[in-house]
């Protein structure tokens, strides 16, 4: 097992809240970029944070620190959202985002959080339905920020509008918005990044790459039945029938009352003779 793979294995099994988001994101990228120097990129992020920290007064307020962070990340360093080619897989690999200074909400959020934490801000990722956001904790509450929109602050009405586009004919009140603003655990952030990649690779017909992403999600979430179902479908497309059978069966063990349990049972019955031919 390679050194990055060993590091990923340790990280995937950790449920600690202080896991480095940058390290996890770079280890995801190391699957695609053989020989990627993860530590070199971590040092670059550390240096970005150090440069900004040295400029700030020790008694700076949270609001002032956020203004300084936004100016530094978006104006000086030049990070921005890739609205022209949103589904370019490079937007999901942190090494590429650091090099190209362009990304999607979740990778920009990782950069933003990592630099912000190095200047003393309490920042958390928020797995909001429309796209990934950042929460900054204050003494008197919290601010929701959108790194994809250059760190714009979002109020309840802004968030309601974003949710209303998804929840047709359902009134989205403040309590519903609040329910989506819980800080995301590192494993959930990594899983969301990998799901993005899986979707991109499936769309491109790159099923082996999609399978690699899916397997990493399973490592992060071994109790999530849906992820075994997703991986089983990829195994089927690759004609890995035994592996597909194993995952479908595990899916039903984890979720015997699944809505699609009858469909999965049929898939198992159809795959069993195909797998038997391989003996």
Residue ranges and their predicted role:
Residues 1-279:
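A structural boundary/capping signal
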